[in-house]
Amino acid sequence: MDTSLKNNDGALDADNKNYQDYKDEPDKTSDVLDVTKYNSMVDCCHKNYSTFTSEWYINERKYNDVPEGPKKADVHRCTII
């Protein structure tokens, strides 16, 4: 079970920023996904993209339908610690 986002505003803020970056520059999706790896201290593990915050789906219901967007594949799930 992924509890990394519960009671962790830092991780949620990072995800929201990454999502906004994705919307602004959809051709740089891989760069956006890499951003959280460069926080000063992070705890990373592989998670399916579908486990990311529900806010992403609320803000952009067709996010997963974007052809250039990330597929439901393993990416880094990083939490600021």
From Swiss-Prot:
Stimuli inducing this protein: Expressed in the early phase of the viral replicative cycle.
Location(s) in or outside the cell: Host cytoplasm
Keywords annotated in UniProt: Early protein, Host cytoplasm, Host-virus interaction
Region (Disordered): 1-28
Primary localization: host cell
Residue ranges with Basic and acidic residues bias: 14-28
A GO CC annotation given for this chain: host cell cytoplasm
Family: Belongs to the asfivirus L83L family.
Function, in words: May subvert the host innate immune response by interacting with host IL1B and interfering with its function.
Known partners and oligomeric status: Interacts with host IL1B.
Protein name (Swiss-Prot/TrEMBL): Protein L83L
The organism of origin for this protein: African swine fever virus (isolate Tick/South Africa/Pretoriuskop Pr4/1996) (ASFV)
